[in-house]
């Protein structure tokens, strides 16, 4: 693995003021790395699942005033988009890098997926690594650490996915800038791979 990934200074892109200025910095410094990660891990996911995965780098095209606070590359089995499907993400906030699997509010499979997750609730509680985190809103950086959740807490988040129209549910890891600076390029790529490996059983539940 010789792919050049993020640097610890890349987190600082989100301190750039102004929409045009920040977008220019993201396109120059971050997007080429997301494209490279996209190519590598779309191929990895395709191999692991025997499905064709495509990558989608966030364009932030709807933003007219406020600059983005995060950016990412997403992976789905649709060449045209990812928001309507269960998908994987690799990205950055100013406070952390993230690697996720999940469903966001546009996905029509939320009810069926929630039911599948609930059928395997105890397995999810046991098998998700303790240092993984859960997010119920991809637009906010706040998360809940898996090891702090009771089974009932996890059940409520999954039930919410089925019953609340705008509900979302994502799970994965956060890596702080400090942790990131101590990692080699190869260690970060290996971390992405191992995280996706841990999340693939959830993807399988979405497609049973």
Swiss-Prot record:
It comes from the Bacteria. InterPro entries: UPF0637 (IPR009403), UPF0637_domain_sf (IPR053707). Pfam families: DUF1054. Belongs to the UPF0637 family. This is UPF0637 protein BA_4170/GBAA_4170/BAS3872.
